């Protein structure tokens, strides 16, 4: 910037004027100076004189050069003679003072003059001046000052003066410039740029806004003309406006969105725990803090801590939706606060309307909600009076039910009706319908009842919800008082809420769509409908599902104020109004769920409140989530939802009855809504044969996130959005029992009912799946039992036209089988009606408000109530850790991915639940724990039969939850469950402290209770029924242990929140996944709604297996849980990454599985069996049980797996966590996963990514999990191997069950192969790796997990199969097998870990293998007794692998063809697997004989297989690492830490291995061939892991059964699981005890153990074979890489990874290398064939899974029992392996 310095002559200092250019004109300088000095041109003129030359500038155009100094004088305008002598005398003075002295002034002209001199050469100036003048002159035209020439001369003819408007002169020359009297006419703008079509001509140029067009005519924009015609007042932009009739009256803020305190739209809506009402966070905190005793402004309960406030995410979402839709600004609404109180009554009206619409009984039920309406809107006097009566009873509790106060009669029925009617008339909905009227009535009530209604609204929000509670008071005002009587009443209250719910739609309307009365009617009705769907349907459904709980749903969010009836504050926040009210009904009055609810129902209501508007779940959903979710809390949510929604809902009524209902009422409401949302999303994601696809479609918006992330998360969103969309979805939903729930999902709002009714049990499950639904579910377990069934059912019918679904009792108490055509049809009809209604009135609102609430609901309700501990990050999975039973569910939603993932899982689980429900309804009668448990058990069995592990899981969790939480901690547990489930997702800020408090108290207590109860339930369920009890027992034990672990986690997080929570927070995301998996299982047993919600999606497939595993693992988990906490911590990070993979793979698999689902349904049972076997394998006990159970459930599981690979993964992950505690389970599970991989290889990959990641993350804590998933079998990526090394510390020697049994916390020492060490260092290492691996793992996992899983699958699957047939012996064997498997897993894990870090170990392993070659002799002698059992186990495992990869006979022949046979075997095995699969189903005895035969054959091959598996493990880990990194290159790099040595060794040993392989083939043809087959299979699996796994599981299960026969024989002996199935029969004994563990370590180190074990059995041949294997592995790597590239990049990575890993890990890769070399040539063909076969087997796998599910359940108990035995033996081996693993870990840490 140039500048000129000026100073007034009277001043001493110069000021500066800056300008652009080299010069500034005098005119401009004057203007600038005058401007700077604030002088006015009219006052004076300025005289500018050059300070150096004393030259006075007179010409305005004179240019003053920059940096000049001038002196300024003020002179009169006329001008004055210069008083200074600086006039132009002076050309004598130098222009620049700096140059010539002033002495020379006479001789030189000033520079200023010089610059104007044309002839500088002759000028009288110094050369410097001349130069400067020349420079100035030359640059003058370029001076910016001169850029724009001043207009000179006449302007162009078209130019008109801007002042006078006349042409001929510029404005500066305008003759009127001096004329002060001249007033220029109004300037007419030109319509430049405005299309003529947008303009309308006007004749009057003076018309406002008239513009001159280019045609010379005047026109104004059409829109302006319209606006002018309307005559809008133009107000200052920021002046507070009075509520305009158009905006305020047309789109009044829904009452549910109004804060009861400030009467304005809620900002940062929070739910107060006492009464479930929602307020602005600031308002309620201020009110509480300003009151002396922290008195609730609505229910006047004292000591309500502001920290207990739960963020009402649903309501917040509703508010956001409302604001977005209406452009509402709080300022405007501030004057609307009075209406809010009236609005609460309208909400009951809406509910009432809805209920009448839905069904009159519900309307009556809605009466409690109606009570507020009574006072608010008196027009429907009769209705109001009845409502008032009912509400009166509630109103007193409300203590602020002015409207209901008039008729504080406890006649809820009357109240509801009145409320509905009055609100109807009041609300804008009046236009649309009585239902619609509520909105109108609401609006009118707003205006007329502002004071009284304001109070009423406030009271309704406070007292209304209390009335909702009061309705429970119908059911028992105690419920209203917080006692939440487990009767239909509470649900009715919610139902009554529906009367209030009318405002609900209206409020939903207002909430989300407050746009205009018509819109409100349209939207409001839709909103109300949606609210009803969300709130009431949620509530009712939830209530239905939860039984009475759902009646609160009628209060459902649609009538936020009525919803307030449960929690008055929730009136506004309860846009749907129901959730908070429901919460209130459950918690608000006397018995806020503070104790029961970690975060009281309000916690739920807050989130529900937010979602409430969109869902009517804000309050209702919250209430649902909290209230109903407990009822629905059973993690059966998905499958149960699908299969047994009605039955489960009825069961929920039965199970929790009133207590559960009351406690879980709000939770269930919220959770139910969430579940609805999630279900819708989850359905789509699930793409299960069940309405999964429908679900996802309905909630497609959420489907994306669900698919991408955890089901629960997107599920929650889906819930909210899906609610509105779900209507269209409903047809798909009805596909299963859950189909109804799907349809139900279609009616997002209506969801509540459905949920309550069909899903209450599933809801529990679903609760775990979805945050919000979890909230519902949390209560669902309780609510489920609530008698609301009938009313709710009616209400449900009204909305759904499915009386049973509406009837909570009918739904819960009496198992309403959605499979029942009539029930299904009723539900569909109701759904159709509801959809129509919803679409008519609520769709817009649902679309806007619901979608977000869905996520919020899921997250909010489940997680919100999750104790803060778990919910450090409300939506992180971390919470799930704390959710032992219910928080896991939340965590599912939470788990970062999991909010969606849970959603996805929830969707899957819901789908599965539908099936599970249906099947479980069939099997409902025999439940271990009372009706609920029986139903859950039966549902689980039904689910197993149906092939849904998720249903079982949900059922299990529900059972566990309900039995443990409901029966033992009926209120507390339920509350805790709701709180966990609801608090975590919903709890935003307020819930944190209280959440922690509640969690520490209730959740911790619950977990503690659940721990004993889980254990007690274990025994209880065991006593309750061998099969059912076993299933449940296993689930229960899992819950107990896991809950204990979760309790520990919970406590840990509390006691060490910074450290543990920080740890858990990162892991929590994973742990929320893994925890939501583990805890999903835990919560499946305990409060698995949320975990199920999240995990359900991931684990839909995994869940069936996982459930069983969890059942088995739960026994183990009791001991293992503590480690599992660590493991889960580690796992959580892994899981975090894995869920991503899981999502991708899940989607992949879902797509594949969805397509395959139905095709596989028949074969699903077979494959399911295998998959279950595989999954169960990780924990032989569990596997045994899951074998049966999974055989039954495998179809379902397969469906789940196929539909929800992530779920399966999650199950695996969670089981993996547990298995992480017990590597045996890990081993078992890996086979299971392999088997499952067959059906869901991608899923397996996800699981592996996740499970492995779990192992990685939780390797320290539960490395076994990873092991079983990725390296458990024998294939672990270097990451895995590192993890496994850490795991080796735990030395999976301790089975999960062992670990669980050792719940005392043998974690550090026992490390139980849970590999707690890895949790610590591997966790971080692997977390980062896992993230990389997760990105690559889906690819690598596809291949690797397949090989690993396949091998493991083969081993444990056989074991599992054996358990199926001989559950007890099998379980023993399985236990041993688990131990062995655990060892193997740990060794393999170590191998995997050591594959990179212990590739050193490879040399070491070679030494090991040499040693173990020698040792085999010794061990053979030492462990000959175990040899047979181990042989059987190894045979079982190996044969299982062989069978899973090929028929045993085919494999035997293929084995003989060692190298060539491997590819052929791989191909035949796949076919044979199918054959064996069929054979297995048709001739299990034959299979057993075959198994014995093949076992003998495979005794050596089994070891080889294990070695191959170990190699696979390593390669898999290498793959994992490569996946982490870049795939194969990273395999080399990552694996280099672990596998590089193997690579180097491989180079050396590759030749050796082929030689050894030849020797091994010579010496042990079977063994070598088995190895080759294994290797080939591994390669094939790598390349075609999916297909292979699919094929393998069937065959594996056939093998299992055959091997089971063998194991039956050897069952007594199997001490440790065949740590390496590939060990020879001679080695089997050894490996059973010491050898097994040592080899595990070796394998863990660099899979040396596998090869060592093989070497033990093969002797030096093993070593040679190892080298051969290395060579072949390299060969196979190349071929596998090529083949896998052909197969898929994932598989390509996986296969090459497997092969290189095999090559890389000579020790661990010995056998694997054999397989690799064997399969190297055949790898391409094998992999291709395997892929095809696996696809085929995928289908079969599902069937087998279904069959196995049933068998697995029964076997699970035995497995759990055997796990204890195994634990003992595993402990011994564990100590040995610990030492080895420590060494390996050291190596691994070095390599890492």
Curated annotation (Swiss-Prot):
Zn finger region (RING-type): 259-300
Biased composition (Polar residues): 621-634, 1258-1276, 1436-1447, 1618-1627
Annotated region ((Microbial infection) Interaction with Ebolavirus VP30), positions in chain: 549-571
Basic residues bias: start-end ranges: 735-770, 931-940, 1727-1750, 1761-1773
The DWNN domain, residue ranges: 4-76
Gene Ontology molecular function: protein kinase binding; RNA binding; ubiquitin protein ligase activity; ubiquitin-protein transferase activity; zinc ion binding
Chain span(s) of sequence motif PPxPxY: 560-565
Gene3D superfamilies, sorted: Phosphatidylinositol 3-kinase Catalytic Subunit, Chain A, domain 1, Zinc finger, CCHC-type, Zinc/RING finger domain, C3HC4 (zinc finger)
Pathway participation: Protein modification; protein ubiquitination
GO cellular component terms listed in the entry, alphabetical order: centrosome; chromosome; cytosol; nuclear speck; nucleolus; nucleus; protein-containing complex
Keyword Metal-binding: yes
Region (Interaction with p53): 1433-1544
N6-acetyllysine modified-residue sites: 130
Annotated EC: 2.3.2.27
Tissue expression notes: Highly expressed in the placenta and testis. Expressed at lower levels in the brain, heart, kidney, liver and lung. Overexpressed in esophageal cancer.
GO biological process: DNA damage response; DNA replication; embryonic organ development; in utero embryonic development; mRNA processing; multicellular organism growth; protein ubiquitination; regulation of DNA replication
Compositionally biased residues, Acidic residues: 1634-1646
Zn finger residue spans: CCHC-type: 159-176
Compositional bias of kind Low complexity: 374-393, 685-719, 1692-1723
Keywords assigned: Acetylation, Chromosome, Cytoplasm, Cytoskeleton, DNA damage, DNA replication, Host-virus interaction, Isopeptide bond, Metal-binding, Nucleus, Phosphoprotein, Transferase, Ubl conjugation, Ubl conjugation pathway, Zinc, Zinc-finger
Region listing for Disordered, in residue ranges: 326-347, 371-410, 532-601, 621-640, 645-799, 847-1290, 1321-1348, 1360-1665, 1682-1792
Modified residue annotations for Phosphoserine: 244-247, 360, 516, 768, 770, 772, 780, 815, 861, 873, 957, 1179, 1221, 1277, 1328, 1341, 1347, 1646, 1648, 1651
Annotated protein name in UniProt: E3 ubiquitin-protein ligase RBBP6
Protein species of origin: Homo sapiens
Lineage, opening ranks: Eukaryota, Metazoa, Chordata, Craniata, Vertebrata
Gene that specifies this protein: RBBP6
């Amino acid at each position: 910037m140039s500048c000129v310095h000026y100073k007034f002559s009277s001043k001493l200092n110069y000021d500066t004027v800056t300008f652009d250019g080299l010069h500034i004109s005098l005119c401009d300088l004057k203007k600038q100076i005058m401007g700077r000095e604030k002088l006015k041109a009219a006052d004076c003129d300025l005289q500018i004189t050059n300070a150096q030359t004393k030259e006075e500038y007179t010409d305005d155009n004179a240019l003053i050069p920059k940096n000049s100094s001038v002196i300024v004088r003020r002179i009169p305008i006329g001008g004055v003679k210069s008083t200074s002598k600086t006039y132009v005398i002076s050309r004598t003075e130098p222009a620049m003072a700096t140059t010539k002295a002033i002495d020379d002034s006479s001789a030189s002209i000033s520079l200023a003059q010089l610059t104007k001199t044309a002839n500088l050469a002759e000028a009288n100036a110094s050369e410097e001046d001349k130069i400067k003048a020349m420079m100035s002159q030359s640059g003058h035209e370029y001076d910016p000052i001169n850029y724009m020439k001043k207009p000179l001369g006449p302007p162009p003819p078209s130019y008109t003066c801007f002042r006078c408007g006349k042409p001929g002169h510029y404005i500066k020359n305008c003759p009127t410039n001096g004329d002060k009297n001249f007033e220029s006419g109004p300037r007419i703008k030109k319509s430049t740029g405005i299309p003529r079509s947008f303009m309308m001509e006007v004749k009057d140029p003076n018309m406002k806004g008239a513009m001159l067009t280019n045609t010379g005519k005047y026109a104004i924009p059409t829109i302006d003309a319209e606006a002018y015609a309307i005559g809008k007042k133009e107000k200052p932009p920021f002046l507070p406006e009075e509520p305009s009739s158009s905006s305020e009256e047309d789109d009044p803020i829904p009452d549910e969105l109004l804060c009861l305190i400030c009467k304005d739209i809620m900002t940062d809506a929070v739910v107060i725990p006492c009464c479930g009402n929602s307020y602005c966070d600031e308002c309620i905190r201020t009110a509480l803090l300003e009151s002396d005793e922290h008195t609730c402004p609505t229910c006047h309960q004292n000591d309500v801590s502001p920290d207990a406030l739960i963020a009402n995410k649903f309501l917040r979402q509703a508010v956001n939706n409302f604001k977005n839709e209406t452009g509402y600004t709080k300022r405007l609404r501030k004057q609307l606060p009075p209406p809010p109180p009236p609005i609460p009554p309208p909400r009951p009206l809406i509910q009432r309307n809805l209920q009448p619409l839905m069904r009159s009984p519900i309307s009556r039920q809605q009466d409690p909600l109606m009570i507020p309406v009574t006072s608010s809107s008196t027009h429907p006097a009769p209705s109001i009076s009845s409502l008032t009566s009912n509400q009166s009873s509630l109103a007193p509790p409300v203590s602020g039910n002015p409207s209901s106060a008039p008729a504080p009669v406890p006649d809820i029925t009357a109240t509801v009706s009145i409320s509905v009617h009055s609100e109807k008339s009041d609300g804008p909905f009046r236009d649309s319908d009585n239902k619609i009227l509520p909105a109108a009535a609401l609006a009118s009530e707003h205006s007329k009842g502002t004071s009284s209604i304001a109070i009423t609204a406030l009271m309704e929000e406070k007292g209304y919800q209390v009335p909702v509670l009061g309705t429970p008071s119908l059911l028992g005002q105690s419920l209203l008082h917080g006692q939440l009587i487990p009767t239909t009443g509470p649900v009715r209250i919610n139902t009554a809420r529906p009367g209030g719910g009318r405002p609900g739609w209206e409020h939903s309307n207002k909430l989300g769509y407050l746009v205009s009365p018509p819109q409100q009617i349209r939207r409001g009705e839709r909103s109300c409908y949606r609210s009803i769907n969300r709130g009431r349907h949620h509530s009712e459904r939830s209530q239905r599902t939860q039984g009475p709980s759902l009646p609160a749903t009628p209060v459902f969010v649609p009538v936020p104020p009525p919803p307030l009836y449960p929690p008055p504050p929730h009136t506004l926040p309860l846009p749907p109004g129901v959730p908070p009210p429901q919460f209130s009904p459950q918690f608000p009055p006397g018995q806020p769920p503070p104790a029961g609810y970690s975060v009281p129902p309000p916690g739920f209501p807050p989130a529900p409140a937010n979602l409430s508007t969109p869902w009517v779940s804000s309050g209702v959903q919250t209430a649902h989530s909290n209230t109903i979710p407990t009822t629905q809390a059973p993690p059966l949510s998905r499958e149960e939802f699908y299969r047994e929604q009605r039955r489960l809902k009825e069961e929920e009524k039965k199970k929790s009855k009133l207590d559960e209902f009351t406690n879980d009422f709000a939770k269930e409401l919220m959770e139910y809504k969430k579940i609805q949302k999630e279900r819708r999303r989850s359905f789509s994601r699930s793409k299960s044969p069940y309405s999964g696809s429908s679900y996802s479609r309905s909630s497609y918006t959420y489907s994306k996130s669900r698919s991408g992330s955890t089901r629960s998360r997107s599920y929650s969103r889906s819930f909210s959005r899906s609610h509105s969309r779900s209507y269209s979805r409903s047809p798909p939903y009805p596909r299963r029992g859950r189909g109804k729930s799907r349809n139900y999902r279609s009616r997002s709002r209506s969801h509540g009912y459905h949920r309550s009714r069909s899903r209450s049990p599933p809801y529990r499950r679903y609760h775990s799946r979805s945050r919000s639904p979890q909230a519902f579910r949390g209560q669902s377990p309780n609510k489920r039992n609530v008698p609301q069934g009938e009313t709710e059912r009616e209400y449900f019918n009204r909305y759904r036209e499915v009386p049973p679904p509406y009837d909570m009792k009918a739904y819960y108490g009496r198992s309403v089988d959605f499979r029942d055509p009539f029930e299904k049809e009723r539900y569909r009809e109701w759904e159709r009606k509801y959809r129509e209604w919803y679409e008519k009135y609520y769709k817009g609102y649902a679309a806007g408000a619901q979608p977000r609430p869905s996520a919020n609901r899921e997250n909010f309700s489940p997680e919100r109530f999750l104790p803060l501990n778990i919910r450090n990050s409300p939506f992180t999975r971390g919470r799930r850790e704390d959710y032992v039973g219910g928080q896991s569910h939340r965590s599912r939603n939470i788990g970062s991915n999991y909010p969606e993932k849970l959603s996805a899982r929830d969707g899957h689980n819901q789908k599965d639940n539908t099936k599970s429900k249906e099947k479980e309804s069939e099997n409902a009668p025999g439940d271990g724990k009372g009706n609920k448990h029986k139903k859950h058990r039966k549902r689980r069995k039904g689910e197993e039969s149906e092939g849904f592990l998720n249903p079982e899981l949900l059922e299990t969790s529900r059972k566990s939850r309900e039995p443990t939480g409901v029966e033992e901690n009926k209120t507390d547990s339920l509350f805790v469950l709701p709180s966990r489930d609801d608090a975590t997702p919903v709890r935003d800020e307020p819930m944190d402290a209280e959440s922690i408090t509640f969690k520490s108290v209730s959740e911790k207590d619950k977990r503690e209770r659940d721990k004993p109860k889980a254990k007690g339930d274990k025994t209880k369920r065991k006593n309750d029924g061998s099969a059912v009890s076993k299933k449940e027992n296993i689930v229960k034990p899992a819950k107990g242990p896991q809950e204990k672990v979760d309790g520990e986690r919970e406590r840990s997080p509390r006691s060490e929140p910074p450290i543990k929570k920080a740890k858990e927070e990162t892991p929590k995301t994973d742990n929320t996944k893994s925890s939501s998996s583990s805890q999903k299982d835990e919560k499946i047993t305990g409060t698995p709604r949320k975990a199920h919600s999240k995990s359900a999606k991931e684990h839909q497939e995994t869940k069936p297996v996982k459930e069983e595993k969890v059942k088995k693992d739960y026994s183990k988990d009791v001991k293992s849980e503590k480690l599992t906490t660590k493991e889960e911590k580690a796992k959580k990070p892994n899981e975090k990454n894995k869920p991503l993979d899981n999502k991708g793979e899940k989607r992949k698999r879902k797509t594949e599985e969805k397509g395959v689902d139905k095709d596989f349904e028949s074969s699903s049972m077979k494959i399911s069996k295998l998959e279950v076997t595989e999954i169960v394998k990780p924990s032989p006990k569990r596997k045994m049980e899951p074998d049966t159970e999974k055989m039954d459930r495998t179809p379902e599981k397969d469906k789940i797996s196929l539909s929800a690979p992530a779920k399966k993964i999650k199950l695996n992950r969670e089981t993996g966590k547990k298995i992480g505690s017990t590597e045996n389970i890990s081993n078992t599970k890996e086979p299971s996963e392999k088997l499952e991989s067959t059906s869901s290889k991608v899923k397996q990959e996800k699981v592996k990514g996740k499970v492995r990641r779990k192992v990685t993350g939780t390797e320290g804590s539960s490395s076994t999990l990873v092991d079983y998933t990725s390296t458990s079998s024998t294939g672990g990526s270097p990451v895995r191997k590192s993890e496994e090394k850490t795991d080796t510390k735990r030395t999976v020697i301790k089975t999960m069950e062992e670990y669980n049994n050792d719940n005392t916390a043998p974690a550090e020492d026992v490390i139980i192969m849970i590999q707690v060490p890895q949790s610590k260092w591997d966790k971080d290492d692997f977390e980062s790796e896992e993230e990389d691996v997760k990105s690559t793992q889906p690819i690598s996992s596809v291949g690797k997990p397949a090989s690993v899983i396949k091998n493991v699958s083969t081993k444990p699957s056989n074991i599992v199969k054996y358990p199926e047939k001989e559950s007890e012996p099998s379980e023993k064997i399985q236990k041993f097998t688990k131990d062995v498997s655990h060892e193997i897993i740990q060794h393999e894990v170590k191998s995997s870990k050591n594959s990179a870090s212990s590739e050193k170990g490879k040399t070491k392993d070679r030494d090991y293998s040499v040693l173990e070659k020698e040792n085999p002799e010794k061990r053979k002698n030492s462990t000959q007794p175990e040899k047979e059992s181990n042989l059987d186990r190894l045979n079982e495992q190996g044969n299982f692998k062989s069978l899973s990869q090929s028929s045993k006979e085919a494999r035997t022949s293929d084995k003989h063809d060692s190298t060539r046979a491997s590819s052929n075997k791989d191909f035949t095995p796949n076919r044979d697997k199918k054959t064996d699969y069929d054979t297995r189903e048709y001739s299990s005895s034959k299979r057993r004989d075959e198994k014995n035969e093949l076992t003998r054959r495979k005794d050596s091959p089994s070891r080889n297989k294990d070695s191959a598996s170990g190699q696979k493990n390593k390669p898999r880990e290498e793959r994992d690492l490569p996946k982490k990194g870049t795939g194969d290159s990273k395999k080399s790099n990552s694996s280099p830490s672990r596998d590089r040595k193997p690579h180097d060794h491989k180079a050396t040993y590759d030749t050796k291995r082929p030689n050894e392989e030849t020797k091994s083939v010579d010496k042990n043809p079977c063994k070598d061939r088995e190895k080759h087959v294994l290797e080939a299979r591994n390669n094939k699996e790598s390349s075609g892991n999916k297909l292979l796994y699919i094929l393998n599981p069937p065959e594996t299960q056939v093998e299992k059964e055959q091997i089971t026969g063998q194991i039956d024989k050897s069952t007594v002996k199997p001490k440790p699981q065949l740590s390496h199935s590939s060990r020879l029969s001679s080695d089997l004994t050894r490996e059973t005890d010491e050898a097994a563990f040592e080899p595990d370590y070796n394998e863990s180190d660099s899979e040396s153990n596998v090869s060592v074990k093989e070497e033990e059995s093969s002797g030096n041949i093993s070593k040679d074979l190892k080298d051969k294997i290395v060579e072949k592995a390299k060969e196979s790597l190349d071929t596998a890489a090529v083949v896998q590239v052909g197969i898929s990049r994932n598989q390509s990575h996986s296969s090459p990874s497997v092969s290189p890993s095999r090559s890389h890990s000579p020790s661990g890769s010995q056998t694997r290398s054999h397989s690799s070399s064997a399969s190297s040539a055949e790898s391409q063909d094998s992999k291709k064939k395997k892929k095809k076969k696996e696809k085929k087997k995928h289908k079969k796998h599902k069937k087998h899974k279904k069959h196995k599910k049933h068998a697995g359940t029964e076997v699970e108990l035995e497995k759990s029992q055997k796990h204890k035995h195994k634990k003992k033996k595993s402990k011994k081996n564990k100590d040995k392996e610990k030492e080895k693993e420590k060494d390996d870990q050291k190596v691994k840490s070095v390599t890492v």
